[in-house]
Amino acid sequence: MIVVVDDRDMVTEGYSSWFGREGITTTGFTPTDFDEWVESVPEQDIMAIEAFLIGECADQHRLPARIRERCKAPVIAVNDRPSLEHTLELFQFGVDDVVRKPVHVREILARINAIRRRAGASATSGADGTQLGPIRVFSDGRDPQINGIDFPFPRRERRILEYLIANRGRRLNKVQIFSAIYGIFDSEVEENVVESHISKLRKKLRGQLGFDPIDSKRFLGYCINIE
């Protein structure tokens, strides 16, 4: 899930629609609401956030540090002003990257993925996706590849696979996966739907790989395990 902070409801709603077309859930906040939320959100919920997108708002300068107090997810600022000085200021405030409008959400997703690669990972990461064993994921709306061949998954299953690979080495519980895929405020869908998605995903991966790469332990959660 991606959190968008902007003074304008029209902007946060627009991002929700655009990211939704790529299968990505977003939640929008005004700066005031964001302050209240980031102060009280449970640890497991904020750890499910994949990135923060900071738009035009009076508190743009202090939000990166506020986020860093709770989370290490990528922070990207959207610069509405064609000003080099403002772009440099945003980097000084502590953002990981700055994009200028107009920008496609797939470019934002690619930049998020690039920030993660620079942070370091055990999987092979490059300009064209992240490779873990025979599986390559792209995290920008494209279907994953298995042994170099495109393999389409339903949107939710694809997002779960991307999330597991992005968090390789960590065991993720059902709540974390649900929050990342559906958003932390979605009360219309039951968390148990995650088990159904993962069951279908495991069956498909097993059919392609000849083994089950998703390790599960009761009460502890799931992790992807490929030598």
Swiss-Prot record:
Ranges where the Response regulatory domain occurs: 1-116
Gene Ontology CC annotation, any one: protein-DNA complex
Molecular function as annotated in GO: phosphorelay response regulator activity; transcription cis-regulatory region binding
Coiled-coil blocks: none
Pfam families listed in its UniProt record: Trans_reg_C
GO biological process, one term: regulation of DNA-templated transcription
Keywords: DNA-binding, Transcription, Transcription regulation
PROSITE patterns per record: OMPR_PHOB, RESPONSE_REGULATORY
Lineage top rank: taxon: Bacteria
Known function: Required for transcription of flagellar genes.
Misc: There is no cognate histidine kinase partner identified so far for FtcR.
UniProt-recorded name of the protein: Flagellar transcriptional regulator FtcR
Name of the gene this protein is made from: ftcR
